[in-house]
C-alpha cells in the first residue's frame, strides 16, 4: 500500500460540490472514476475541504492509497489524461508520495480561501460563474476595516449555515483582508478550519458595509448577537475559491 498526496484545481461551476453523490456530477466522483480507469481499483479519496456546489479550487488537497507504489509522474499523467477525455474541468497539479501518517483533512493546520467580487456596472461576459457581480459601488477600505472586527477567536453562530454540522461554532479566524484591484475586490480568509457557509456569510455581510448600509459596529454587533438572523445575505458560491492548504 502506498499513499499519495494530490493537489487539485477545478472549476466548480458544473459540479454538485466535492462530495460523491449518487447520480450527481461531483469533483470527488470524477477523480475517483479517473483513478479507477487508471488502476482498476475502486478507491476513496480523502480531501482537506469538501467544497460546496459551484465553489472552485486552485489548491485543493486530497490523499489516496494505491495497492501499487506507482511513480508519481505515471499517476499524474494518467489522471489528467482521463479527466481531460471526460471533459472535466479538473486538473491534478501535483502528485507526491507521502507517509501513511499524512491525512489530507486531519493533518491540515491552515486553510486559505479567496472570495472574488466584480464591482462594475457591466455584467461579466467571461467569468460569470467565477465571481460575484455587484454593480453598486463598494467601499473596499470600509469593508477591510470592518472585517478586522471578525478576526480572532469567536463564536461565529451568526455566520454559519443553519445546517452546519460542526460540533462547535467557535473558530479562530487568523486573517480576513479586503483589497481592491481595479474593478475586482478580493477577500482573503485564513483559519485552521471554517464553518459551513462562513466565508460566503462574511462576504454578504461585508457587502452591506461596502454599500454603506452597515457600519463596522453593526457588523461587530451581528457577530456578538450569535444569531443567524443577524447575518447579511449569503453570497453566491461562484466567487469562492479554496486556494491553499498548509500542513
UniProtKB/Swiss-Prot annotation:
Q: Where is the active site?
A: 52
| Annotated GO biological process | tRNA pseudouridine synthesis
Sequence positions that bind substrate: 113
- What reaction gets catalysed by this protein? uridine(38/39/40) in tRNA = pseudouridine(38/39/40) in tRNA
InterPro entries, alphabetically?
A: PsdUridine_synth_cat_dom_sf, PsdUridine_synth_TruA, PsdUridine_synth_TruA_a/b_dom, PsdUridine_synth_TruA_C, TruA/RsuA/RluB/E/F_N
| Broad EC category | isomerase
EC number(s): the record gives 5.4.99.12
Tell me a Gene Ontology molecular-function term this record carries: RNA binding
What Gene3D superfamilies does the record tag this protein with? Pseudouridine synthase I, catalytic domain, C-terminal subdomain, Pseudouridine synthase I, catalytic domain, N-terminal subdomain
User: Keywords assigned by UniProt?
Assistant: Isomerase, tRNA processing
The entry sums up its family as follows:
Belongs to the tRNA pseudouridine synthase TruA family.
Biological role: Formation of pseudouridine at positions 38, 39 and 40 in the anticodon stem and loop of transfer RNAs.
Quaternary state and interactors: Homodimer.
PANTHER family xref list: PSEUDOURIDYLATE SYNTHASE, TRNA PSEUDOURIDINE SYNTHASE-LIKE 1
Know the name of this protein?
tRNA pseudouridine synthase A
- Gene responsible for this protein: truA
